[in-house]
Amino acid sequence: MLLRRLSIQWKITLLAGLCLLGVVSLLSGLSVYRTQHSTSLVKQSSTEMLNEAAQARLQSRGEVQAMRIQRYIMDAYQYGKGFSRQVLFLRDQAQKRFLDAYDLREDLTRQVKTALEGNPELLGLYVAFEPDALDGKDKLFAGQGELGSNDAGRFSIYWSQATPGHLESEAMAESLLQDTSPGPSGSAYNAWFTCPKTTGQPCVLDPYFDDVGNKKMLMTSIAFPLELDGKVIGVMGLDISMEKLQEIAVEGSQELYEGQGRVSIVSAAGLLAGHSADASKLSKKLQEVYPNQGTDLLQAIAANHEQVFHQDDQLRVVEPLQPIPGSKPWGVLLEVPQNVLLGPAIELQNELDNQSVQGTVSQLGFGLVAILIGLFAMWLTARGVTRPILNV
């Protein structure tokens, strides 16, 4: 009814306008769709690229941390390996020159002290022989601690320095050498003595707390077998502080995304030797600190293979390391929140979204202007066409 009341001019204008509106809307819609589709592809590919780059960066940081830890432990290992050879050399020379047993024990006690003084980073240094394996005269020196001899006369000297330069010594009693009570890792307390004796190979122990002087300190021990003709006749070992590893963990976390990451150092048995987030967790089992993923993380370390885990909005990278040759692997665990790690990707997505919205608004605006201009042009054209008819 309304159309019948319209003039020919407005009917032509309306029909042409509808056609123009349909064409412009179709072209604008197609343009908006293609723009959004292209933006989506760019967002996806850019996010994947930035995610891979961030993950690669985190893995490279893990390798750097692993190298720092390995270098620290290997320095102590090389020092201990050299000194263990020196101990065997002193024993050999004493036998060849028929050195008095008193002088040999006194000399060994002094050499252990001197070796510890020469390396202030060490907490302790010890030498313990099997019964009568040093000179065959243990009974003559029973209870002579000043000569490194314990209650049974066995040579078992331990020098310690809770503070560099302040040395204390003790002859380790038979009860201490035979203490098999389990520690936090499940190994016997005297693993520092029995491990190299049983395996015939150097051993690095899991972290444990022990008293050095009057201080309880977290440490680990590297123990070496003293072998003669293929038989282990004693053990030489050194204690190193885990404070340095904790420092490495804290420094490493500060370097991760401006301190927003976390670094942990894990022993072969899954005990924390370093934990930047909370020092009170040191010596705790990995499964206690990470109840949801601790077992998987420990399995990755045991497999000696770098792995990446995504859980609880966290990206975790496990980087294994071998503290000393032939030992079971330890590991470095790096953690970064996903939103921090993907910060650049999220910023790029937001920027692309903003540009997409602006582009869509601009296209729709230009389309609307084109429609209005087209309608006005159609109106003028219709007016020119219908004027002669109206004048008849």
Segments and roles (model prediction):
Residues 215-252, 315-321, 327-341:
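Conserved beta-strands of PAS-like sensory domains
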Residues 116-201, 207-214, 272-291:
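Extracellular/periplasmic ligand-sensing ectodomains of membrane signal-transduction proteins
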Residues 193, 197-225, 257-262, 290-331:
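Membrane-proximal, non-catalytic sensory/regulatory domains of signal-transducing membrane proteins
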Residues 107-115, 235, 239-281:
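Solvent-exposed, extracytoplasmic
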Residues 9-14, 19-111, 117-123:
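Juxtamembrane extracytoplasmic/periplasmic/luminal helical "stalk" adjacent to the first N-terminal
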Residues 1-10:
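Non-catalytic regulatory/interaction regions at protein termini and inter-domain linkers
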Residues 13-21, 25, 259, 339-392:
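Cytoplasm-proximal transmembrane signaling helix
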